[in-house]
């Protein structure tokens, strides 16, 4: 899922000059206030900021107005126009070298809270692109998709887990407009995936954080048509929605309550949460109980069940002592090697075999994520290799791939209420080359887990759009999980 604001089909004619159809450079919707600044060059010439405008939903914004738009959602499938004022509109087929630089921040990924009522520090997303583009009338057509999977064997009462997927697995294709929401669910059904359906609300709900009646009708019609079952509703807390300050505790509560109500409206029994602030959880517990929702904090790489931050969450849970609280186990935490998808990506970015090998050696050590990342960047600089050529991969390689032992999940098994069956590849032998699925299945079967395993393909963080069909991979992963859990059951 390339981290770009523009694609090969982005350049359009506009009455005021030229326009660039922008793509949101992330996997979920963001507030327009998440955009700090955008600058453009055309054929090497810098465009003055006063000659740039953004058009979204019938409104026009100056670049310096964008950080103020905390009430305006840039939905993942929207492509606002960045209008560049020129003396004349270009002709169709006219070629130009377009450079674009965008600085964004991710409002739900807080590095440090603000002090004295000021804004906190948030994870940035920096985009730098330079592409040769030709003027087009509109976006490229989506490619035809081929069904290559035979019908799956039916689920049985003896299967310990129910299978499903998070629609996040098709993030890149959904963002590109290859599917609308209905079409995505139809494709899932066509491939025999399910019955569990999980969503990230900020990705799929156009009126986020509110679930509209129109979305509810679409949702119910698809579920009735295909016999799906709602498994997990992914909630974020957009603490940095405003640029001048963080959310207040009351705003955090109200925002979360809106999401919980949306989850209930869609029929979800469980909400995946990413904030475990004790006071916020204490206020939200009565809401969850009233709405009959389970709350599950996600344990994700680089952490595991016994990492220090997770131990603090476990202590908070013990203090609150509520049956509503649990965990989502994300298998990015328990990988035995780096994914081939990532290794292909860093090779495309220019790393040679020596650098790729050194990256894997550093990853396998027991140093902290930050220490490993800094050691690798130091190695690159020592070889006069620019870490910037890797973009976000220099960080994601160590942040998204954890190497905790699968057996550690047993330490919290009674509190695990949902599973993200994270994966990146399925090889020719039907195995995940970086994650030991037979061992994970054994740990969870023997630990007594009996909930959903929700497939989550996160290869889109590293793969190019169209490099693989993620939903075909999900079907193949389901075959692996199904075979593994039935083998364990047969051995008991």
What do the PLM-derived regions correspond to, one by one?
Residues 166-181, 239-253, 274, 400, ...:
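Active-site mouth loops of central-metabolism enzymes
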Residues 179-202, 261-270:
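Catalytic domains of carbohydrate-active enzymes, especially glycoside hydrolases
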Residues 161-167, 195-199, 230-235, 271-273, ...:
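Hydrophobic faces of well-ordered beta-strands that scaffold small-molecule active sites
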